[in-house]
A protein has these predicted regions:
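Hydrophobic positions on the alpha1 helix immediately C-terminal to the Walker A/P-loop
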Residues: 71
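Glycine-rich phosphate-binding loop
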Residues: 66-68
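Non-catalytic substrate-recognition and accessory regions of acyl/acetyltransferase enzymes
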Residues: 1-63, 74-166
Length: 166
């Protein structure tokens, strides 16, 4: 896991964008000239860190069942209450930087299929408590932990899927 610390000698943009384009995009959504934009300032006041879940990969047989949101929540629960957790609900590209040497068996998707899957991913993540901080945000954020927990959600999921198989 990468960690970035601002010692005050660089602008936040340089720190975010210099690390990865993903963090640069989060900066563009949350900051203007190194200050939180007013639309998110009240929501984020008091948080110390931004944790970015860059990718979640499920085996094909587990996709489309709402497990991605539960897994994202379980990851978020590993961090402190002073951390805001962010992710972007978008399917991974088989040729993208998160799939070096084609390690993961990812399908090639049309633009329409990507948008359809992104909507499903967003619904799964929002079902686990993630939300956009403002209309038009491409990222979803978890700013505090709500009930149910990831464990409670997986127990519910398991019960629902046992009934389907029975």
């Amino acid at each position: 896991m990468d960690q970035i610390i601002n010692d005050g000698t660089c602008s936040l943009f340089d720190i975010f964008d210099g690390h990865s384009s993903d963090l640069g995009h989060i900066y563009e959504e949350l900051f203007d000239d190194d200050e939180l934009i007013p639309a998110v300032e009240d929501e984020l006041l008091g948080y110390e860190n931004i944790v970015l879940i860059k990718s979640i990969i499920l085996k094909p047989e587990y996709r489309g069942q709402g497990l991605g949101g539960i897994l994202a929540l379980a990851i978020a629960e590993l961090f402190g209450e002073q951390d805001i957790v962010a992710l972007k609900p978008w399917p991974m590209n088989p040729d993208g930087p998160d799939n070096p040497a084609g390690v993961w068996d990812l399908p090639r998707l049309t633009e329409t299929a990507q948008k359809t899957i992104a909507k499903k991913l967003g619904k799964s993540y929002m079902g686990a408590g993630f939300k956009p901080l403002f209309k038009g945000s491409s990222h979803l954020f978890l700013t505090h932990y709500r009930n149910p927990t990831a464990t409670q959600l997986i127990d519910t999921w398991h019960k629902e899927h046992q009934n389907v198989k029975a």
